Design a protein with these regions (language model features):
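Ser/Thr/Pro/Gly-rich low-complexity linker/stalk segments immediately outside membranes or between
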Residues: 27-40
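Bacterial extracytoplasmic/cell-wall-associated proteins, especially those involved in peptidoglycan
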Residues: 19, 64, 80-300
Length: 300
């Protein structure tokens, strides 16, 4: 079978530009043999897990040269009404949480809008993967196994926006680099995230504040392991020490692992957790007294 080839020629000064069969050729008029033009390859761009939009913009600037402010403005102005998975997102909220972290190939001429489209497409595919057999009800709400009676803002179940918000908190609470570790270490991190998701669901179920240091860091713009007492008093709806329930929106762009965690949590009787230093491994507690003992044991 012969492939059909399309040929387009453009003559500029002493050179004819020919497009044929998906390749570009420059033919000088005095030469018969075409000379292929050097094709600029796509650029591999890696957006790591758990970055906020401002950090994604910084990464895009470093890897593709698009100014940070330009990308941030494009995100702010992006028309996203056609995406079904964004229907539960408040109209005035940003796309925080939905720019899926992954490794992409972008043409050097890619615009901010094209990059955003690819990342939103990545989220759509990965969220569907995380769902597995779990489907939303007729109202677009997910009823989470083990937490069927959970109500958020007087409504039973979790919307996609609420799930992504919780996943973004879990991402920042449990994220650590296991890229060079074993499959066992990655599996352990996945299990930790599902267990932490269960802890947060336990707290949400009784109206107990999440008390997430990651949300404090988002409110203050810092990246510290232990926020100061002054940080904990920050006036912000993202301060989950002062405000019970979920934050107003996501605090990062979570990984597939964290999306799976909120959709398929591990139900336990734990209500507290902390991170061993320096490994970052999570230690769980059933009550505050156990939590204090673990702090004295692992955080000295």
């Amino acid at each position: 079978m012969h492939k059909r080839l399309f040929l387009v020629t453009i003559t500029l000064f002493f050179v004819t530009i020919v497009f044929v069969g998906g390749a570009l050729y420059a033919i000088q008029r005095r030469h018969r043999a075409p000379e292929p033009i050097a094709v600029v390859p796509d650029t591999k761009v890696t957006i790591i897990e758990g970055l906020a939009i401002s950090e994604v913009a910084t990464s895009i600037e470093k890897q593709l040269g698009i100014p940070k402010a330009t990308f941030e403005q494009a995100v702010k102005n992006f028309e996203a009404s056609e995406y079904d998975f964004l229907k539960s997102k408040p109209a005035k909220s940003s796309l925080e949480g939905f720019l899926f972290p992954d490794t992409y190939l972008f043409a050097p001429t890619s615009t901010s809008e094209e990059i955003i489209e690819r990342m939103l497409g990545g989220f759509e595919v990965r969220f569907a993967q995380a769902q597995g057999s779990l489907k939303p009800n007729a109202n677009g709400v997910f009823i989470i196994s083990g937490y069927e009676n959970l109500s958020i803002n007087g409504k039973r179940g979790m919307t996609i926006y609420e799930l992504v918000t919780l996943a973004s908190i879990i991402e920042r609470e449990t994220g650590r680099d296991v890229s060079k570790g074993t499959a066992d270490s990655r599996e352990r991190l996945d299990t930790e995230r599902r267990t932490v998701a269960g802890i947060f669901y336990n707290r949400l179920g009784i109206g107990q504040a999440l008390q997430s240091d990651a949300t404090i860091n988002y409110a203050t713009g810092k990246r510290v392991a232990s926020p100061s007492l002054e940080d904990l008093d920050v006036e912000s709806l993202y301060n989950t020490y002062e405000h019970a329930g979920l934050t107003p929106g996501p605090i990062s762009n979570p990984s597939l692992s964290s999306l799976e965690a909120v959709l398929h949590p591990i139900k336990t009787n734990y209500f507290y957790f902390l991170h061993k230093q320096p490994s970052g491994e999570v230690v769980y507690s059933r009550n505050f007294d156990e939590h204090v003992r673990n702090k004295n044991l692992y955080l000295k």
